[in-house]
Amino acid sequence: MKVGCIGLGDIAQKAYLPVLAAQPGVELHLQTRTPATLERVAAVHHVPGERRHTDLDSLLAQGLDAAFVHAPTAVHPEIVGRLLEVGVATYVDKPIAYELADSERLVDLAEERNVSLAVGFNRRHAPGYAQCVEHPRELILMQKNRVGLPEDPRTMVLDDFIHVVDTLRFLVPGQIDDVSVRGRVENGLLEHVVLQLGGAGFTAIGVMNRLSGSTEEVLEVSGQDTKRQVLNLADVVDHKGQPTVRRRGDWVPVARQRGIEQVVLAFLDSVRAGKVLSARDALASHELCERVVRAVQEQGA
């Protein structure tokens, strides 16, 4: 199976390539416009010269079965569009695009061409989060915070807060019928945002504070007098009277802990099986992000 990796930035190098390069039966091709990066990364993963590409045309000429897109978000629409047009099953790091219209167009194109389009919502596959589906979830709280990093609202929401939005959508136990958004925008930069989702018998709250003094990610699900916390995607604390802690094993790879290994293997399995994946549900997370962006822009105006 010929698999291309487009864009060789930090996330591709640290999380995706170690998984892809280890898969038997995968002929890995790399593409980036930066020759020095291409040579260095290819050498690390023993990718021979004929599988190293500095332009998309050269890569597409190889007759790919699947592609992973880790290029900057701004160029996603062009790259993903070309891949889908020629029938290549495509996995794109979130978001599909910064603008909802572009995301909608690409999801429609994938369905028209009957080609898989998968979006990198790895947290759905992270063991600590996936297991929360089995826990009472009358109240869901998720925080993903950073230090000293206010940002343009659209960039922050689509590049980062989208993880919170999608995780809440994944975990809510019923249909969402109420959405509210609060944010603080100073000098055009979003400092914090709070999203509250409600439905029959449940409330889900997502928080991102870019001036929090701490880089952290905390998920809590609770109900029926029990609570589960997942700290930084690693440690799981169950509360029912006394807390019990399950720590990540010392030898568990980060890619597995964060759900990246699992989402990659699930995508490759679908390609091998000829199963077409739809990004329609992922698009719903993008639509909710658009509501968040517009709400905080109005509040900051």
List where the protein language model places each region.
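NAD(P)-dinucleotide binding in Rossmann-like oxidoreductases
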Residues: G201-L265, K275-S278
